[in-house]
Amino acid sequence: MWKSILAIALGAALGALLRWFLGLKLNSLLPSIPPGTLLANLVGGYAIGAAIAYFAQAPGIAPEWRLLIITGFCGGLTTFSTFSAEVVTLLQEGRLGWAAGAIATHVGGSLLMTLLGLFSMNWMLGR
């Protein structure tokens, strides 16, 4: 149990630190759809897709690795709450087009990146 807790905590801390760094460095570049938040969600989508594909072909790997990467790191990196707050701010400002664009970009982009992660990992593994 403690190994699982430590794996999740370590992964989450690393993912959250990366998300914070991306926001700090990139979000001021385009406040309407902050690129740091978007990049965190896209990278997290790709990483979780690749991890799912990898762990599916390697069932003997200790479950703590899956917890560290998928539950911890990807969970700490991706951010539905920040994305939601940014969209609500756009809606409150009456910027409906930007809000719709942000929703489409984050949700569609994250789904596409997850599929890309799955397909690319399967390709690299020869599956």
From Swiss-Prot:
Disulfide bonds: none annotated. GO terms for cellular component: plasma membrane. Its main location: membrane. One of its GO terms (molecular function) is metal ion binding. Keywords: Cell inner membrane, Cell membrane, Ion channel, Ion transport, Membrane, Metal-binding, Sodium, Transmembrane, Transmembrane helix, Transport. Na(+) is not transported, but it plays an essential structural role and its presence is essential for fluoride channel function. Na(+) binds at residues 75, 78. GO terms for biological process: cellular detoxification of fluoride. It comes from the Bacteria. It catalyses: fluoride(in) = fluoride(out). The chain crosses the membrane at residues 4-24, 36-56, 68-88, 99-119. InterPro entries: FluC. The keyword Transmembrane applies. Fluoride-specific ion channel. Important for reducing fluoride concentration in the cell, thus reducing its toxicity. PANTHER family: FLUORIDE EXPORT PROTEIN 1-RELATED. Belongs to the fluoride channel Fluc/FEX (TC 1.A.43) family. This is Fluoride-specific ion channel FluC. The gene is fluC.
